[in-house]
UniProtKB/Swiss-Prot annotation:
Binding site for Mg(2+) 2: 223-224
Function: Catalyzes the transfer of the phosphoribosyl group of 5-phosphorylribose-1-pyrophosphate (PRPP) to anthranilate to yield N-(5'-phosphoribosyl)-anthranilate (PRA).
Signal peptide: none
Annotated binding of anthranilate 1, by residue: 79, 110
Gene Ontology biological process: L-tryptophan biosynthetic process
Protein name, as recorded: Anthranilate phosphoribosyltransferase
Organism ancestry: Bacteria, Pseudomonadati, Pseudomonadota, Gammaproteobacteria, Enterobacterales
Binding locations of 5-phospho-alpha-D-ribose 1-diphosphate: 79, 82-83, 87, 89-92, 107-115, 119
Molecular function in Gene Ontology: anthranilate phosphoribosyltransferase activity; magnesium ion binding
């Protein structure tokens, strides 16, 4: 372990095996908080490599509580967070809309660690119990098209890690690997990252993890599709990786201002999202949600982004998504 730590502190890159060994030690609490802080900061300053991401994921997956495997195709829609954009919870809102559109979503979620408001914080405000058994979560997915897998419940060895991350209050390798640690282990995902440089390494990791179809998005260093800038896409499909750029007119909507998607604390985000899901939200933020849902449609085989966006807007404006919220809160 001393050799591995010295490599990190000297700015050298670890291979998959070394990273696996390191993160195995972290999971087994063999690394103290001071060492862990130094490791996370050193990796962040140098930049995490593809092999380090993969090694960390493999180690963490071995210590995860499992989820009953569905027999049907389902997806996650998730972001790394830590982009300091102070936007509303776009992926969480998009997941709810996607489920109301008929798609199965196993949403990996967490509380606020490196952002003001985490997905779990919003879901709790809506009265949705995210701390239910894996079996009951699976039933929720079966019956209501969506379930929420609360990270601390499935990754119990992350408790010490979470404490350190909350103290550091910066984006670390755990932001990068968290979307890759969904306990349901979907083969479809829409994953947002807040750094263009991370997109291809993550696509390669998803390929190694045998994802069937994945779309990685990044726009203006925000881990979502946005309408105030172009969005870079890297798509993994049938083991082939392609990249392209999307603009708002590809979705049939107009550019908006970055401030249009700003949120705030949990209460403020809750109020904004509630209006959106009731079909009463401002057009710019509603359309931002719709274009993210349009990308979700794409991994289920619906490739026409304009039609996808149009249908998502129709569902949002109907208020059906808020009806879904009520069902989920009673589950």
């Amino acid at each position: 372990m001393k050799i591995i730590l010295n490599k990190i502190y000297q700015g050298d890159t670890l291979n998959i095996s070394e990273t696996y060994t390191l993160f195995k030690s972290i999971m087994l609490k063999k690394i103290n908080n001071i060492e862990l802080s130094a490791i996370l900061i050193a990796l962040k300053i140098r930049g995490e490599s593809q092999n380090e991401i993969l090694g960390a994921v493999k180690a963490c997956l071995e210590h995860m509580i499992t989820f009953p495997k569905p027999t049907y195709m389902f997806s996650d829609i998730v972001g790394t967070g830590g982009d300091n954009s102070n936007s509303i919870n776009i992926s969480t809102t998009s997941a709810l809309v996607g489920s109301a559109c008929g798609f199965k979503i196993a949403k990996h979620c967490n509380g606020n660690i490196s952002s003001k408001t985490g997905s779990a914080d919003i879901l709790k405000k809506f009265g949705i119990n995210i701390q239910i058994s894996p079996e009951k979560s699976k039933k929720m997915l079966d019956e209501l098209n969506i379930c929420f897998l609360f990270a601390p419940q499935y990754h119990i060895n992350f408790k010490v890690v979470t404490q350190v991350r909350k103290i550091l209050r910066i984006k670390t390798i755990f932001n990068i690997i968290a979307p890759l640690l969904n306990p349901a282990m979907p083969k479809l995902t829409v994953m947002g990252v807040c750094n263009f440089k991370l997109m291809l390494p993550i696509a390669q990791v998803l390929k190694t993890l045998n994802y069937h179809h994945a779309i990685i998005v990044c726009s203006d260093n925000i881990d979502e599709v946005t309408l105030h800038s172009f969005t870079k896409i890297i798509e993994l499909k049938n083991n082939n990786i392609t990249s392209y750029i999307l603009h708002p007119d590809d979705f049939g909507v107009k550019y908006c201002h970055k401030n249009d998607i700003l949120g705030g604390n949990t209460e403020e985000n809750y109020n904004i999202i509630k209006k959106i899901l009731q079909g009463k939200g401002p057009s710019a933020v509603t359309e931002t949600i719709a274009v993210n849902v349009a990308i979700l449609f794409k991994i289920f085989g619906y490739s026409n982004l304009k039609k996808n966006t149009e249908y998502a807007l129709k569902v949002i404006r109907s208020g059906k998504v808020y009806e879904k919220i009520i069902q989920l809160s009673k589950f």
